[in-house]
């Protein structure tokens, strides 16, 4: 794994002769050079996320330039983001063309499907100098009529004026909404904040506590479903109106305020970091169990 947004990475790509391709997941722009958050991220306030579109665009442009110069295939993994950022996906959003792109069930309107797209020289099934030497691609679920129909309908709707209008001012709209929610949380002195990459949001905690994970249950009492894993992502539909969002913000603040009032944001003063204490407790419990056995 090479570091993102790093001159050293570009140097490696320029000088090594054994690199065939570079795979990029554009979602990493929300937290470059950090693994996907796990449940452990709920135990401390060390988690950070910040999306800088201009900086990540410059990085992708530099990466594209090096890949072109060295004959390296640039691949975008858009299974998660799909067409959330722009009608043309991350390629259109960042203004950088990949050689190959992967998509998932977004293209199938929610039906299970995997799609690989790319330029002709990488997608053709034979060499021009050996046309009979064909690369077969087979699968028992290939070209399923229902899935193909759903994909065609999705692409038609994606190209319609109605859907195209949803993308106008998308970043400005969702950045303003994230700022609005953070302001409401700050007004209530709640140790919770959000960071966003357009309509993909992540929940952050300002104070370390072994009970931060309980926010998901308080949100559920307000009718909001936060993933039970440590990712804490909120994925919004692009057609959310301002009225829809204000209702979500009201419920989010109400849930966090209830959790605070019930005392679950409390952190023990003058003690070792929560994560370190939990590791000790876990090891102690395992050792005790082994002695009993």
Residue ranges: model-predicted function:
Residues 1-293:
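Conserved N-terminal phosphate-binding loop of PLP-dependent enzymes in the Aspartate aminotransferase
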């Amino acid at each position: 794994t090479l570091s993102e947004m790093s001159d050293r990475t570009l140097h490696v790509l320029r000088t090594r002769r054994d690199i065939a391709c570079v795979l990029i997941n554009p979602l990493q722009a929300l937290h470059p050079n950090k693994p996907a958050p796990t449940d452990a991220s709920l135990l401390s306030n060390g988690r950070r996320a910040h999306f800088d579109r201009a900086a990540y665009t410059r990085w992708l442009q530099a990466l594209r330039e090096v890949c072109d110069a060295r004959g390296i295939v640039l691949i975008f993994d858009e299974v998660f983001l799909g067409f959330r950022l722009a009608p043309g996906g991350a390629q259109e959003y960042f203004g950088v063309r990949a050689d190959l792109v992967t998509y998932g069930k977004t293209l199938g309107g929610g039906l299970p499907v995997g799609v690989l797209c790319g330029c002709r020289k990488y997608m053709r099934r034979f060499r021009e100098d050996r046309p009979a030497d064909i690369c077969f691609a087979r699968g028992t679920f290939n070209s399923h009529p229902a899935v193909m129909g759903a994909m065609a309908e999705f692409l038609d709707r994606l190209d319609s004026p109605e859907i195209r209008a949803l993308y106008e001012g998308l970043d400005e709209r969702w950045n303003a909404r994230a700022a609005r929610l953070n302001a409401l949380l700050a007004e209530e002195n709640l140790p919770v904040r959000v960071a966003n990459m357009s309509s993909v949001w992540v929940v952050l905690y300002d104070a370390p506590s072994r009970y931060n994970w309980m926010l998901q249950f308080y949100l559920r009492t307000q009718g909001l479903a936060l993933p039970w894993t440590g990712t804490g992502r909120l994925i919004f539909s692009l057609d959310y109106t301002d009225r829809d969002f204000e209702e979500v913000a009201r419920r989010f603040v109400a849930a966090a305020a209830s959790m605070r009032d019930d005392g679950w944001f409390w952190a023990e003063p003058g003690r070792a970091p929560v994560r370190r204490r939990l590791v000790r407790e876990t090891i102690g419990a395992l050792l005790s169990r082994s002695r009993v056995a």
